A protein has these predicted regions:
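Sec/Tat signal peptide C-region and signal peptidase I cleavage site
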Residues: 20-26
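Extracytosolic ligand-binding ectodomains
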Residues: 2-12, 26-374
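Gram-negative bacterial Sec-dependent N-terminal signal peptides
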Residues: 9, 18-19
Length: 374
């Protein structure tokens, strides 16, 4: 073989190796952990997050991915349990994943967020509404949903101005999310001088509320707010109807899903609930709604589109910054606006959305709902 031939062969080999290395780098997926309840009494919320996030990943990958890399979801089950959430967070750290969509329950998000921020992992929750989550000075924690401090006044204002109850009971499940939103609603009632006859907690998982219902009947309560999730609210509604306790019930987005109709049956008719806007009804999202339906998935869940938005803003920030460094992406999130299926999103320095609206809905026994506010 001549020197010239050898040089050409060597050159082609070098080019081939460089190309292979480049292809290997480009093909390396960007892993995103989906952390939330896969099992447990509120696993339905994990399903909402999952279908929203996975749809976003699918759509982004179809469009070419992020800077030449595909996105890949890795699911972790925290069962909405704070201790399990810590174990999940540590597993994500050990697995070398630097991006998280989750967690859902505020009590799980808080301890997990501490770990992620310490370990340099970017977290965007589509469901945790407790203000405390973003009040610790963390720089890598964001959310694509509003706060209890927004949702509480929305509920309170409706109750004060539209329902005008004579005596109220404000209940919660003794957990961070439920007690937090219940406290915000009580504050609105107190400010309006509406008597709150009872403010107390129930234990998550309880199924017998007969004593509590008897107490509310004795106190002539005509309005009940429950801060918590659908399993307890469903039982409260059903047992209240069975006890002929005729009060209007209301709860946050944690009670607003189809399972409550399965638990409470006809007793769920007329329940009031604060939820994000029905993003599935927005004409600009028609193509996504159709894509969900083709997969036989329900796009109506409160956290479906916020989870989609969480993945999208994460990917958009990677593209804008041409980086996979969580710190760089966090800074990009804080300094740009993002057009998503939930609207144009802008984040403040703490990682909260600058604007987000909750709407009061009337729930129907068939699982449908009617908007009462805009």
């Amino acid at each position: 073989m001549s020197k010239t031939t050898r040089r050409i062969s060597t050159l082609f080999a070098a080019i081939a190796l460089a190309g292979a290395a480049s292809y290997s780098l480009a093909a390396e997926p960007i892993k995103i952990a989906l952390a939330g309840p896969v099992t447990g009494p509120v696993a339905q919320y994990g399903d909402m997050q999952s279908i929203g996030a996975l749809m976003a990943i699918e759509q982004i990958n179809k469009a070419g991915g992020v800077n030449g890399s595909m996105l890949e979801a890795v699911t972790y089950d925290d069962a909405c349990d704070p201790k399990q959430a810590v174990a999940v967070a540590n597993k994500i750290v050990n697995d070398g994943i630097r991006f998280v969509v989750g967690h859902l329950c505020s009590g799980s998000s808080q301890p997990a967020a501490d770990i992620y921020n310490e370990e340099g992992i970017l977290m965007i929750t589509a469901a945790s509404t407790t203000p405390e989550l973003t009040q610790k000075g963390h720089t890598l924690i964001f959310r694509t949903i509003g706060l209890d401090s927004m949702q509480g006044p929305t509920a309170g204002n409706y109750v004060v101005n539209q329902l005008k109850p004579k005596r109220a009971a404000v209940l919660h499940d003794k957990q961070q999310y439920g007690e937090g939103i219940a406290t915000a609603v009580k504050a609105a009632l107190d400010e309006a001088n509406i008597p709150v006859a009872l403010f107390e907690g129930v234990t998550a998982g309880d199924k017998d509320f007969s004593a509590l219902i008897a107490k509310m009947k004795m106190e002539d309560v005509d309005f009940v707010y429950f801060g918590g999730y659908h399993p307890e609210m469903g039982m409260l509604l059903r047992q209240s109807a069975e006890s002929n306790f005729d009060a209007r019930f209301m709860g946050p987005e944690g009670v607003g899903n189809s399972d409550i109709s399965a638990i409470a049956g006809e007793a769920s008719e007329g329940m009031l609930v604060t939820l994000p806007k029905a993003f599935d009804a927005d004409p600009k999202n028609a193509h996504l709604v159709e894509a969900f339906k083709e997969k036989k998935q329900d796009p109506r869940g409160a956290f479906v589109f916020p989870a989609y938005a969480a993945v999208q803003v994460m990917a958009d920030a990677m593209t804008m910054s041409n980086s996979q460094d969580p710190e760089v992406i966090a800074e990009t999130l804080r300094n740009n606006s993002f057009d998503t299926p939930t609207g144009v999103l802008e984040f403040d320095e703490k990682g909260d959305l600058k604007n987000f609206s909750f709407i009061v809905y009337e729930w129907h026994a068939d699982g449908s709902k009617t908007a009462l506010t805009e």
